[in-house]
Every structure is written in structure tokens, then in C-alpha cells.
Amino acid sequence: MTHNFPLIRALPLLLGMLFAGPALADKADPVGEVSTAFKLVGPNHKILVEAFDDPKIAGVACYLARPKTGGVKGGLGLAEDPSHASLSCHQTGPITLPAKLKAGEEVFDVSTSLVFKEQKVVRFYDEKRNALVYLTYSTKLVDGSYKSAVSAVPIMPWG
């Protein structure tokens, strides 16, 4: 007598999706990294610097610096990265705003743990000051508040 176990058959696919998900979400270009702590086994702790372009507004690029946990767990993708990051966004060409811009729209995210924790970047438009404002935050609550950083891009004539 054979039993049909659909969950057991689907387990490899589910695990593959779980581990591939964070890699697919990361749309940044690596700029550089600095090793911050030596680990005898596995990769060192480091700070990564990554760049990404705003997917809806041409002419804006952002640089995100964030810690990456090393060691055995970090090397296997099982460690949780610290929740802080810094952000710097700049105008890199002419900016034309779309007719409708959603306040707080997500422009970038990267997984910082095996499950549930992410570093996100969202965009706002400050019409009064004619500037795009980018906010990065971790989705993990730390000491009663979320770790965050902000960067503003004044929209200037180009050329």
C-alpha cells in the first residue's frame, strides 16, 4: 500500500522558494565592503555598500550601507543581520515626476534574516520643498522603535 504525501513531495520546492526569495528581492549593485570583525570560521562580519536606482523615477540613485553578519551562520545565510543602515540618495540625471506618486511607496528591500526581517527603502515627495525623500528602516522592532535613516534629493534642473 502506497501513501500519497503531497507535502513531502512539495517540501523541496517550498524550501527552494524560502531560500531563493531573499536573493530575488535584492536588486542592488554591490559597490564595496569593509571587513569589521575577523571570524576564524566562516566569512568575517562586514559592512556592505550597495547602490540601486529608483525603479519609477529615472535620475535618482541611492547608496545603502548595512552590516552583514559573518561566521558559520552568516556564511550559511542563517544569521540575522543587525537592524541599522545608512542611506544617501542623489540626482544622477534629469528627473521627471510621474503624474501620480504614491506616498511611502517601496523602492527597495533586502532580506536581513532567514525569515521575516527586511531592510526597506520607501519614497515620499515633498511638494513644498520640491524634493524626493527616501527613508530606510528595518522591519524588526529594536528597543521600542524601528532603526531608520533618511535622505532627501532636491529636484534640480539638469544639464
Residue map of PLM features:
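N-terminal signal peptide c-region/cleavage motif recognized by signal peptidases
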Residues: 20-22
